[in-house]
């Protein structure tokens, strides 16, 4: 999918399935309310749980998160780019559907070249939640995504990064590991 077509598709509320570090992810424009509702419905994920947002560069995340100190940013980049997700206080502009019932947003600068290129071509950060029905095993291939979601999502080809487990999730403020 070409960059302009991808941008148009996402800005129009489209949902994609794409390869990430460990599995295929479902993604959409993180600022499009209709797309967020659609993704949550397709996945069967409760709104209260919140979603992860990935980016190619930190700058793609800045409008969604509250300002961070230079020390906090440095801490984040000890793990980025890579499969490490930080819980960062959300900005007032961050959609409630992204945060769920939380005051923080889960964010990651991806090391997966395909996912990073998607963010670059889309011109934005992307939602990244595992491509599965809530509570089920995530899809590892485009074929599995087609089988699970049919025509409800645009499946983009590619291979996952080969990581065997989902990204670690850590709270930036407290340092607590939420998911090892």
Curated annotation (Swiss-Prot):
Sequence ranges assigned to domain YrdC-like in this UniProt record: 1-180
EC code: 2.7.7.87
Entry keyword set: ATP-binding, Cytoplasm, Nucleotide-binding, Nucleotidyltransferase, Transferase, tRNA processing
Catalytic activity, as annotated: L-threonine + hydrogencarbonate + ATP = L-threonylcarbamoyladenylate + diphosphate + H2O
GO cellular component: cytoplasm
PROSITE patterns: YRDC
GO molecular function: ATP binding; double-stranded RNA binding; L-threonylcarbamoyladenylate synthase; tRNA binding
UniProt GO BP: regulation of translational fidelity; tRNA threonylcarbamoyladenosine modification
Localization of this protein: Cytoplasm
Entry's family note: Belongs to the SUA5 family. TsaC subfamily.
HAMAP family xref list: TsaC
Protein name: Threonylcarbamoyl-AMP synthase
């Amino acid at each position: 999918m070409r960059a302009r077509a991808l941008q148009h598709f996402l800005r129009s509320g489209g949902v994609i399935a794409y390869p990430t570090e460990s599995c295929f992810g479902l993604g959409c424009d993180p600022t499009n309310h209709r797309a967020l509702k659609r993704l949550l419905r397709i996945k069967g994920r409760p709104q209260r749980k919140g979603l992860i947002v990935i980016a190619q560069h930190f700058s793609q995340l800045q409008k969604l998160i509250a300002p961070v100190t230079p020390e906090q940013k440095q801490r984040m980049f000890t793990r980025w780019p890579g499969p490490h997700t930080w819980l960062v206080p959300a900005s007032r502009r961050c959609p409630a559907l992204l945060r769920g019932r939380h005051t923080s947003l889960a964010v990651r600068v991806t090391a997966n070249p395909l996912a990073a290129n998607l963010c670059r071509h889309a011109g934005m950060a992307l939602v990244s939640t595992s491509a599965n029905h809530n509570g089920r095993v995530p899809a590892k291939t485009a074929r599995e995504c087609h089988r699970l979601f049919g025509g409800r999502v645009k499946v983009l080809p590619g291979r996952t990064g080969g990581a065997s487990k989902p990204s670690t999730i850590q709270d930036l403020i407290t340092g607590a590991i939420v998911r090892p």
